[in-house]
Protein backbone atom coordinates (compact mmCIF):
# COMPACT_ATOMS: atom_id res chain seq x y z
CA UNK A 1 0.00 0.00 0.00
CA UNK A 2 1.25 3.46 -0.82
CA UNK A 3 2.78 5.44 2.00
CA UNK A 4 0.05 8.07 1.64
CA UNK A 5 -2.73 5.53 2.39
CA UNK A 6 -5.40 7.00 4.65
CA UNK A 7 -7.69 4.72 6.60
CA UNK A 8 -10.08 6.91 8.55
CA UNK A 9 -13.36 5.54 7.22
CA UNK A 10 -16.42 7.05 8.86
CA UNK A 11 -19.88 7.89 7.56
CA UNK A 12 -19.34 6.47 4.10
CA UNK A 13 -20.76 4.07 1.52
CA UNK A 14 -18.77 1.85 -0.81
CA UNK A 15 -18.76 -1.06 -3.23
CA UNK A 16 -16.44 -4.05 -3.08
CA UNK A 17 -15.82 -5.74 -6.43
CA UNK A 18 -13.90 -9.00 -6.74
CA UNK A 19 -10.78 -8.43 -8.86
CA UNK A 20 -12.53 -5.50 -10.51
CA UNK A 21 -10.90 -3.80 -13.48
CA UNK A 22 -11.15 0.02 -13.13
CA UNK A 23 -12.01 0.71 -16.77
CA UNK A 24 -14.74 -1.93 -16.74
CA UNK A 25 -16.13 -0.63 -13.45
CA UNK A 26 -16.31 2.87 -14.90
CA UNK A 27 -18.20 1.51 -17.89
CA UNK A 28 -20.63 -0.70 -15.96
CA UNK A 29 -21.50 2.04 -13.44
CA UNK A 30 -21.81 4.76 -16.11
CA UNK A 31 -19.02 6.76 -14.48
CA UNK A 32 -16.87 9.13 -16.49
CA UNK A 33 -13.74 11.28 -16.52
CA UNK A 34 -11.51 9.02 -14.40
CA UNK A 35 -8.29 10.68 -13.29
CA UNK A 36 -5.47 8.97 -11.44
CA UNK A 37 -5.51 9.72 -7.72
CA UNK A 38 -3.69 8.48 -4.64
CA UNK A 39 -5.55 7.24 -1.57
CA UNK A 40 -5.14 10.60 0.13
CA UNK A 41 -6.31 12.54 -2.91
CA UNK A 42 -9.24 10.30 -3.71
CA UNK A 43 -10.60 9.89 -0.22
CA UNK A 44 -10.07 13.54 0.68
CA UNK A 45 -12.04 14.54 -2.42
CA UNK A 46 -14.91 12.17 -1.62
CA UNK A 47 -15.10 13.30 2.01
CA UNK A 48 -14.78 16.98 1.14
CA UNK A 49 -17.73 16.67 -1.24
CA UNK A 50 -19.89 15.70 1.72
CA UNK A 51 -19.50 19.16 3.25
CA UNK A 52 -20.10 21.09 0.02
CA UNK A 53 -23.49 22.25 -1.36
CA UNK A 54 -26.40 19.80 -1.52
CA UNK A 55 -25.79 16.85 -3.75
CA UNK A 56 -22.02 17.21 -3.99
CA UNK A 57 -21.56 14.04 -1.96
CA UNK A 58 -23.13 12.24 -4.92
CA UNK A 59 -20.81 13.72 -7.52
CA UNK A 60 -17.61 11.66 -7.33
CA UNK A 61 -16.34 8.24 -6.31
CA UNK A 62 -12.88 6.92 -5.62
CA UNK A 63 -11.84 3.62 -7.18
CA UNK A 64 -9.02 2.19 -5.09
CA UNK A 65 -6.05 0.09 -6.15
CA UNK A 66 -6.66 -3.66 -5.90
CA UNK A 67 -6.33 -4.70 -2.24
CA UNK A 68 -6.47 -8.30 -1.07
CA UNK A 69 -8.10 -9.25 -4.34
CA UNK A 70 -10.81 -6.58 -4.15
CA UNK A 71 -11.36 -3.23 -5.80
CA UNK A 72 -13.25 -0.77 -3.57
CA UNK A 73 -15.34 2.09 -4.97
CA UNK A 74 -16.08 4.67 -2.30
CA UNK A 75 -18.55 7.55 -2.22
CA UNK A 76 -22.00 8.74 -1.25
CA UNK A 77 -23.30 7.59 -4.64
CA UNK A 78 -23.61 4.08 -3.20
CA UNK A 79 -25.72 4.94 -0.16
CA UNK A 80 -28.70 2.55 -0.28
CA UNK A 81 -31.94 4.15 0.92
CA UNK A 82 -35.70 3.77 0.45
CA UNK A 83 -35.86 5.97 -2.62
CA UNK A 84 -33.92 8.40 -4.77
CA UNK A 85 -33.20 11.70 -3.03
CA UNK A 86 -30.02 12.80 -4.73
CA UNK A 87 -29.72 16.24 -3.19
CA UNK A 88 -30.00 14.57 0.19
CA UNK A 89 -27.34 12.04 -0.71
CA UNK A 90 -29.54 8.98 -1.15
CA UNK A 91 -30.35 6.45 -3.88
CA UNK A 92 -32.85 3.62 -3.94
CA UNK A 93 -31.48 0.35 -2.59
CA UNK A 94 -33.09 -1.30 -5.62
CA UNK A 95 -30.73 0.63 -7.91
CA UNK A 96 -27.73 -0.22 -5.76
CA UNK A 97 -28.75 -3.89 -5.83
CA UNK A 98 -29.05 -3.76 -9.63
CA UNK A 99 -25.51 -2.38 -9.86
CA UNK A 100 -24.18 -5.14 -7.60
CA UNK A 101 -25.98 -7.71 -9.74
CA UNK A 102 -24.46 -6.27 -12.91
CA UNK A 103 -20.95 -6.15 -11.46
CA UNK A 104 -21.18 -9.69 -10.09
CA UNK A 105 -22.23 -10.96 -13.51
CA UNK A 106 -18.89 -9.74 -14.86
CA UNK A 107 -16.57 -10.18 -11.86
CA UNK A 108 -18.25 -12.94 -9.87
CA UNK A 109 -18.88 -11.05 -6.62
CA UNK A 110 -19.87 -7.51 -5.68
CA UNK A 111 -21.23 -5.94 -2.50
CA UNK A 112 -22.48 -2.53 -1.39
CA UNK A 113 -22.18 -1.21 2.14
CA UNK A 114 -23.26 1.89 4.07
CA UNK A 115 -21.85 2.79 7.48
CA UNK A 116 -23.43 5.98 8.86
CA UNK A 117 -23.51 6.04 12.66
CA UNK A 118 -24.73 9.63 12.94
CA UNK A 119 -27.67 8.98 10.62
CA UNK A 120 -28.39 5.50 12.01
CA UNK A 121 -28.11 4.25 8.45
CA UNK A 122 -26.57 0.85 7.77
CA UNK A 123 -26.77 -1.52 4.84
CA UNK A 124 -25.21 -4.45 3.03
CA UNK A 125 -26.22 -5.78 -0.36
CA UNK A 126 -24.37 -8.86 -1.60
CA UNK A 127 -24.38 -10.38 -5.08
CA UNK A 128 -22.75 -13.44 -6.60
CA UNK A 129 -22.69 -14.63 -10.20
CA UNK A 130 -25.38 -12.20 -11.33
CA UNK A 131 -27.75 -12.83 -8.43
CA UNK A 132 -28.42 -10.68 -5.37
CA UNK A 133 -28.18 -13.12 -2.47
CA UNK A 134 -28.64 -10.74 0.47
CA UNK A 135 -30.17 -7.30 1.06
CA UNK A 136 -30.37 -5.58 4.42
CA UNK A 137 -30.99 -1.86 4.82
CA UNK A 138 -31.88 -0.01 8.02
CA UNK A 139 -32.42 3.75 8.21
CA UNK A 140 -33.47 5.71 11.28
CA UNK A 141 -33.92 2.37 13.04
CA UNK A 142 -36.44 1.27 10.42
CA UNK A 143 -35.67 -1.88 8.45
CA UNK A 144 -36.35 -1.07 4.79
CA UNK A 145 -35.47 -4.45 3.31
CA UNK A 146 -34.41 -7.78 4.78
CA UNK A 147 -34.25 -10.43 2.09
CA UNK A 148 -32.03 -13.38 1.25
CA UNK A 149 -29.94 -15.60 3.45
CA UNK A 150 -27.94 -13.79 6.16
CA UNK A 151 -24.16 -14.04 6.02
CA UNK A 152 -22.53 -16.07 8.79
CA UNK A 153 -21.41 -12.95 10.67
CA UNK A 154 -24.92 -11.54 10.51
CA UNK A 155 -26.53 -14.81 11.59
CA UNK A 156 -24.25 -14.92 14.64
CA UNK A 157 -25.08 -11.31 15.51
CA UNK A 158 -28.78 -12.08 15.28
CA UNK A 159 -28.41 -15.13 17.50
CA UNK A 160 -26.44 -13.18 20.11
CA UNK A 161 -28.49 -9.97 19.95
CA UNK A 162 -31.09 -8.53 22.25
CA UNK A 163 -31.80 -5.62 19.89
CA UNK A 164 -35.08 -6.94 18.50
CA UNK A 165 -37.96 -4.45 18.57
CA UNK A 166 -41.46 -5.07 19.92
CA UNK A 167 -42.36 -6.97 16.76
CA UNK A 168 -39.33 -9.21 17.12
CA UNK A 169 -37.49 -7.53 14.24
CA UNK A 170 -33.71 -7.46 14.51
CA UNK A 171 -32.00 -4.12 13.81
CA UNK A 172 -28.40 -4.28 12.63
CA UNK A 173 -25.85 -1.53 13.20
CA UNK A 174 -22.40 -0.38 12.17
CA UNK A 175 -20.64 -3.24 13.93
CA UNK A 176 -22.61 -5.64 11.77
CA UNK A 177 -21.67 -3.71 8.61
CA UNK A 178 -18.01 -4.11 9.57
CA UNK A 179 -18.32 -7.83 10.23
CA UNK A 180 -20.36 -8.62 7.13
CA UNK A 181 -18.03 -6.56 4.92
CA UNK A 182 -14.99 -8.29 6.38
CA UNK A 183 -16.53 -11.72 5.85
CA UNK A 184 -17.64 -10.98 2.29
CA UNK A 185 -14.63 -8.99 1.09
CA UNK A 186 -12.50 -6.54 3.06
CA UNK A 187 -13.39 -3.76 5.48
CA UNK A 188 -11.51 -0.60 4.43
CA UNK A 189 -10.57 0.57 7.92
CA UNK A 190 -8.82 -2.72 8.65
CA UNK A 191 -6.38 -2.17 5.84
CA UNK A 192 -3.05 -0.70 6.83
CA UNK A 193 0.30 0.59 5.70
CA UNK A 194 1.56 -2.97 5.21
CA UNK A 195 -1.37 -3.93 2.98
CA UNK A 196 -0.15 -4.46 -0.55
CA UNK A 197 -2.03 -2.59 -3.25
CA UNK A 198 -1.89 -3.48 -6.93
CA UNK A 199 -2.37 -0.94 -9.69
CA UNK A 200 -3.58 2.64 -9.45
CA UNK A 201 -6.53 4.47 -7.93
CA UNK A 202 -8.91 6.74 -9.84
CA UNK A 203 -11.36 9.51 -9.03
CA UNK A 204 -14.39 9.44 -11.35
CA UNK A 205 -17.57 11.43 -11.93
CA UNK A 206 -21.03 9.97 -11.37
CA UNK A 207 -24.04 10.42 -13.68
CA UNK A 208 -25.42 12.86 -11.09
CA UNK A 209 -22.38 15.09 -11.47
CA UNK A 210 -22.68 15.12 -15.25
CA UNK A 211 -26.40 15.86 -15.09
CA UNK A 212 -25.82 18.94 -12.96
CA UNK A 213 -23.09 20.16 -15.23
CA UNK A 214 -20.45 20.42 -12.54
CA UNK A 215 -17.03 20.85 -14.21
CA UNK A 216 -14.39 18.19 -13.74
CA UNK A 217 -12.45 18.89 -10.57
CA UNK A 218 -8.99 17.55 -10.11
CA UNK A 219 -7.96 15.85 -6.85
Can you say where each PLM-predicted feature lies in the sequence?
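Residues that form generic nucleotide/phosphate-binding pockets
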Residues: 28, 102, 106, 183
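Short aromatic/hydrophobic-glycine micro-motifs
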Residues: 31-34, 109, 186, 193
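Short, intrinsically disordered low-complexity segments
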Residues: 36-133
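Long, compositionally biased intrinsically disordered terminal regions
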Residues: 73, 121, 128-219
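Structured loops at beta-to-helix junctions and adjacent beta-edge loops in soluble globular domains
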Residues: 18, 75-77, 208
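Short, extreme N-terminal segment that most often corresponds to the first beta-strand
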Residues: 1-33, 214-219
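Intrinsically disordered, low-complexity regions enriched in Ser/Pro/Gly/Gln/His and often acidic
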Residues: 7, 63, 114-117, 163, ...
